Amino acid sequence: MTAPHARYRRAVAIPAGMAMATALAFLPNTTATAADEATAAVSADATSLSYVVNVKPGHGTSAYVKKAVGKAGGTVVTSYDQIGVIVVHSSDPDFAKTIRKVRGVQSAGATRTAPLPTAVTADLGTPKALSAAEVAKAEAAPGQDPLESLQWDLPAIKADKAHEKSLGSEKVTVAVIDTGVDDTHPDIAPNFDRGASVNCVSGKPDTSDGAWRPGASESPHGTHVAGEIAAAKNGVGMTGVAPGVKVSGIKVSNPDGFFYTEAVVCGFVWAAEHGVDVTNNSYYTDPWYFNCKNDPDQKALLDAVTRASRYAEKKGAVNVAAAGNENYDLAADEITDPSSPNDSTPGERVVDPSKCLDIPTQLPGVVTVASTGAKGIKSSFSNYGLGVADIAAPGGDSTAYQKPEPPATSGLILGTLPGGKWGYMAGTSMASPHVAGVAALIKSTHPYASPALVKALLYAEADATPCTDPYDIDADGKVDAVCEGSKNRNGFYGWGIADALDAVTK
């Protein structure tokens, strides 16, 4: 078996009747939104690029560098002085080289390889939404929400038993840094935190009403993730892992579906400064799947997002991220990356994943989540790696590979969709919110716990899971991935599969 390679790793969408090998990647596209029009106005010149300039620590350094930006042919869009990151637009092809020579600049680089767009339209791949008949047919057990019987993933992490003890605290907020969240959904509205929600697509916060929502033709990915985390236990639809906590939407994906550095930096800083306890990051930062430290542009992107994620953790947030969907061994000596840069013309390259990092997934302090299917083994697509994958949780898999027990019918993960609907998706994008939900339950149980303590409890309470050996998920007689490590910690499952019951009882 070979792993499917989706253009957008963070947004694998699998219609319920399709095998993983033919999975559709989300292409969240639409015309430019109001938030993007500001960016377009700055970038009327089609050759303009966006940059991040990372300033060395020091009194007055940021002000000095901002003046130098103008002299180098750039325009400051916004500046995050608290972490020393400046977002710049420039049409000068030598801008990065020039600004790197300025005293006080640690690193600088283009956040993309394609010019800033003025407007974009394209097609959209969608998940399979449940029909009205399917919703009506679902039979719930006493005390369950109507669609909960289809959620095999909840008992897989003992969330159903956890809910008998605690639903989580409304004082805890999980931020979904993603494609936007439809807060009008009946399963999301009761738990939505508007004050911690924002649109960061341009790299600058847009707090206008509803700016955090996906457009009508944009990806439902973020809404799906939000429901997995905190869909209310309210007699409607489905139930989230932590149905008593708050969830916010931080939109960082542009109309083309790209998660650029300036938007991701904005998202982490916003979360840091608005009381967020957990961030969920089911994406990788475009346009490079791996950002190499020996490339000046990629190093700048790595520096900027590292500063932002560390700032969020310093302010009290646990950062959780999806491991990725290419069946890569992230602990291997080398990986062949055929997809970067994904916003222009990709070229095949061989990278060392210890020096070229998937961000934010491989950043220090980030909880990296691998995916399991309905049989509790590694999903066919899930990235893995000893010392890289920290923990595992249900992200689904092709029903042909891992079929759930009745009454559940799909091996994929049920979630909320915009417009008051529910539907299935699969990917490490779906595994990560399960862990974010468990982290929120731990924070609810231990309200004064630091991010370090929450992570320590998350790992200690995970159910140790031994390597699946040999791993031949499609039963073709060929090994599809090799798991290294012990039962207590290995490359497929990290410290184990997340445990929601322990999160509320220990």
State where each predicted segment sits.
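Short glycine-/aliphatic-rich beta-strand segments at the starts of folded cytosolic domains
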Residues: 45-55
